C-alpha cells in the first residue's frame, strides 16, 4: 500500500514487488506534468476557454463559471481533453504568461506578481 507525500500529493512507498504503476503512477506523472515548472496562460479568465489545447493551464479566479466554478485559486490543467485541478501549496511559484509576471501563492491567494 502506498503513502501520499504532503507537498505535491505524489504516491510513494509501495512494498517491494507491489505494482503501483497503473493508477498510482499515472496520477503521479500527470500531477508532475501539471505543476512542475508552472506557467499559466491567464489568471483572470472567468469562463473556461472554448477550445483549449491539451497542456494549457490557467489559474482559476474568483467568480469563475462553468466547470471552473468553485475552484478559485486552483490550477486548471487541460489533460486528455478534460480539466484537472490542482490546489497550490503556500510558496508555489507560477509564471503568468499574458502578464509576463512571476506570482507566488500565499495564504491569501496568488500575489500580484513581479514583472520579469
Segments the model singles out, each with a brief description of its role:
Residues 1-64, 80, 89-106, 112-116:
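Extracellular "spike/adhesin" assembly and maturation modules
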Residues 63-77, 84:
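Short basic/aromatic-enriched segments
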Amino acid at each position: 500500500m502506498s503513502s501520499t507525500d504532503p507537498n505535491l500529493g505524489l504516491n510513494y512507498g509501495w512494498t517491494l514487488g507491489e505494482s503501483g504503476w497503473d493508477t498510482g503512477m499515472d496520477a503521479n506523472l500527470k500531477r508532475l506534468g501539471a505543476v512542475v515548472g508552472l506557467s499559466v496562460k491567464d489568471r483572470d479568465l472567468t469562463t473556461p476557454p472554448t477550445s483549449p489545447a491539451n497542456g494549457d493551464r490557467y489559474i482559476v479566479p474568483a467568480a469563475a463559471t462553468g466547470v471552473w466554478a468553485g475552484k478559485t485559486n486552483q490550477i486548471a490543467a487541460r489533460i486528455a481533453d478534460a480539466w484537472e485541478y490542482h490546489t497550490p501549496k503556500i510558496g508555489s511559484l507560477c509564471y503568468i504568461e499574458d502578464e509576463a509576471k512571476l506570482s507566488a501563492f500565499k495564504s491569501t491567494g496568488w500575489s500580484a506578481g513581479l514583472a520579469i
